[in-house]
From Swiss-Prot:
Family listed: Belongs to the actin family.
Enzyme Commission designation: 3.6.4.-
Key words of the record: ATP-binding, Cytoplasm, Cytoskeleton, Hydrolase, Nucleotide-binding
Record function comment: Actins are highly conserved proteins that are involved in various types of cell motility and are ubiquitously expressed in all eukaryotic cells. Multiple isoforms are involved in various cellular functions such as cytoskeleton structure, cell mobility, chromosome movement and muscle contraction.
Location(s), subcellular: Cytoplasm, Cytoskeleton
Stated name of the protein: Actin, larval muscle-type
GO cellular component term of the entry, any: cytoplasm
PROSITE patterns: ACTINS_1, ACTINS_2, ACTINS_ACT_LIKE
Length: 378
């Protein structure tokens, strides 16, 4: 990179299925965190001159959700609606970070095992629509491991749209052992919506689903022993908590608080045949070389918003200990900032001096086209 490019701080943008985390390389937390939502008015505008827009992004869409239909352009970690995604990136650069993308190298993130076309299109939009000088696409789980200060370990990264186990040895992800589950925060929100219906509380619109997400984030936790917790909930009201809805109505929830995230350990709750997160972690370790398993067991790193439930680390410890050889030392690392650890890892990576030759530059892109991304980012 030439000297005038170097004073341009890199931008780190972690596009999650649920939240966009964006900011500047070298910072210790993202400047902008907003929902990956694009909202469009449900009804025709009647007030002339209100300056109604045809679409709203992020927090603005969230605050006007009552009159909008909300759509998430990223589903299960894969971008399904590129026009909306472009709106989100535009909003990120110009409204949230207030920078000109053509002046800053940009680091984007993606889920492991994503379709190749996905990262090519990302590369193309960055260079052709936003004219960035340089860009890079990094695997989310690898960044989380960097953020925890390790180069070897197995990451369980669970966000809103997707969860995956990624074993990493000396900084390299081991692709044959990666496990990907399409079970994550959004599915848990759906499930909580369903079990709240059994209590007679109904949440129907896209806007009301957001209320359920808030209930989930504030009140849910993972039980150490599910059966025992169910018994406690049945025999006393000690586990009940109340939540005030935006209209002032107060609802009470009891065993739903831990039944919802229990789905991570028992996906059959929502009719999925997949193994629970403890089994996928174990299976992923078992697919790795026998010599490195010990290091993986001792470095189980949790990352992403869906690992934020109280009690999840203790439960993982218990479940993996039950599966692993009895003498094995097992350690679950749950950093308090794990909601943003992918972003933090990106901030660390892109501010390393050695990373300068890793960027895909505009010149390289012009010469080789979008497929350059597979050669330079792995």
């Amino acid at each position: 990179m030439s000297s005038e490019e170097e004073d341009q701080t890199a931008i780190v943008c972690d596009n999650g299925s649920g939240l966009v985390k964006a900011g500047f390389a070298g910072d210790d937390a993202p400047r902008a965190v907003f929902p990956s939502i694009v909202g469009r008015p449900r009804h025709q505008g009647v007030m002339v001159g209100m300056g109604q827009k045809d679409s709203y992004v992020g927090d603005e869409a969230q605050s006007k959700r009552g009159i909008l239909t909300l759509k998430y352009p990223i589903e299960h970690g894969i971008i399904t609606n590129w026009d909306d995604m472009e709106k989100i990136w535009h909003h990120t650069f110009y409204n949230e970070l207030r920078i000109a993308p053509e002046e800053h190298p940009t680091l984007l993130t993606e889920a492991p095992l994503n379709p190749k076309a996905n990262r090519e299109k990302m590369t193309q939009i960055m260079f052709e629509t936003f004219n960035v000088p340089a860009m890079y696409v990094a695997i989310q789980a690898v960044l989380s491991l960097y953020a925890s200060g390790r180069t070897t370990g197995i990451v369980l990264d669970s966000g809103d749209g997707i969860s995956h186990n990624v074993p990493i040895y000396e900084g390299y992800a081991l692709p044959h052992a990666i496990a990907r589950m399409d079970l994550a925060g959004r599915d848990l929100t759906e499930y909580l919506t369903k079990i709240l219906t059994e209590r007679g509380y109904s949440f129907v619109t896209t806007a009301e689903k957001e209320i359920v997400r808030d209930i989930k984030e504030k009140l849910c936790y993972v039980a150490l022993d599910f059966e025992q917790e169910m018994a406690t909930a049945a025999s006393s009201t000690s586990l009940e908590k109340s939540y005030e809805l935006p209209d002032g109505q107060v609802i009470t929830i009891g065993n739903e608080r831990f039944r919802c995230p229990e789905t991570l350990f028992q996906p059959s709750f929502i009719g999925m045949e997949s193994a629970g997160i403890h089994e996928t972690t174990y299976n992923s370790i078992m697919k790795c070389d026998i010599d490195i398993r010990k290091d993986l067991y001792a470095n189980n790193v949790l990352s992403g918003g869906t690992t934020m439930y109280p009690g999840i680390a203790d439960r993982m410890q218990k479940e993996i200990t039950a599966l692993a050889p009895s003498t094995m030392k097992i350690k679950i690392i749950a950093p308090p900032e794990r909601k943003y650890s992918v972003w933090i890892g990106g901030s660390i990576l892109s501010s390393l001096s050695t990373f300068n030759q890793m960027w895909i530059t505009k010149a390289e892109y012009d010469e080789a086209g979008p497929s350059i991304v597979h050669r330079k980012c792995f």
